[in-house]
Amino acid sequence: MEYIDKNGIKRKVPTLDPNFKIDRFEGQSKLAKYINNNFISKMDAFTSVRSVFLVLILAFTLGNNLYHYLIALFIVHTYVLVYRGIRFWLERWLMYLIEYCYIGNILLIHFNLFARNNMNIFLSTYSMTSGIISLAVVACDNHADITDTDFLTSCCIHTLPVATMWAVRWKHYLYDNYLEYKGNIIDTENIKFQIDETFLKVLTYPFIYWIVWAVIYFIINTKTLRKYAYSDIYQSTIGDFYKSKDFECLFGDHTKNTVIKYLMMHLIFLLGVTPLSLLNFYSFYFNTIYLIFILLFLGYNQSIKSKEEINKIVKKAEKFDKKD
């Protein structure tokens, strides 16, 4: 397959080569190199301090005052997303920023800033974040590594939304002064399970947003990137999945119609977690247990990763001792 570049030269469209590797900083601008050498490296040196500080602020405000928590959330959320954008720009991973999870996070920011009383925005945000986005913690194998900025950012993107919507949805159970929030934050106290308009919105909103996202994702991946042959920045979740054995077992040859197959797998995942969103929305106890499960999974998964790293260090030390 060929295309005509902007200079009128006929070129071959690059294929998705699983062995393709690049130097991510090769050809970067002076600004990018300066930011990486003088800012990012110094920020990484204090990852543990930053992460513990931010978690303590969010945990304290969440447990005491919902208003204060939403203010802290906006500050932390904005910082996390902007910092991730800078890192992905430097690493040439910008394609990750068009994933479905980021739509849910942007929607949460919109709810927090402009639509705390808008039922439709609340239902959209809740149904998206309490299902597919939060369960991506398991699907993407997230772990709470306080020494790694990228891992921590992924944890925040997948868990902050579900924790926030849990607090907003069940504030009448969680806060003694919840009456103060009436009129300023959406009132959800009287929502009960029944097949009504609210139920249908919780059921369908994630799919409406998914369709919009899928169309945009498909166009960007199959048209824009392919047209200009941006193979060196083709770094997205699809690149992770198409290399996996599970992907090949389900959909066959990963070099054919990769984007469509990835979207199909994404849709299957969304269909599978839809009942989870409904259970979370209508049951306080289920929602609470689910949130605890997500947090425990992050901690447990990190303990497994830490154990593996320790075993590697021990094996290297044993080999070194044997040589001596």
Label the predicted regions.
Residues 67-70, 91, 95-98, 119, ...:
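Membrane-water interface of alpha-helical transmembrane segments
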Residues 28-45, 80-99, 114, 136-152, ...:
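Helix-loop boundary elements of multi-pass alpha-helical membrane proteins
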Residues 210-324:
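C-terminal transmembrane-bundle signature of multipass membrane proteins
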Residues 146-255:
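Generic multipass alpha-helical transmembrane bundles of integral membrane proteins
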Residues 86, 90-102, 107-191, 195:
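Membrane-interface helix-loop-helix junctions at boundaries between adjacent transmembrane segments
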Residues 75-84, 105-106, 128-137, 210-213, ...:
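Alpha-helical transmembrane segments and their membrane-interface exit regions
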Residues 62, 81-88, 109-116, 137-140, ...:
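Transmembrane helix-loop junctions and nearby membrane-interface residues
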Residues 1-119, 287-291, 324:
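N-terminal signal-anchor/initial transmembrane insertion module
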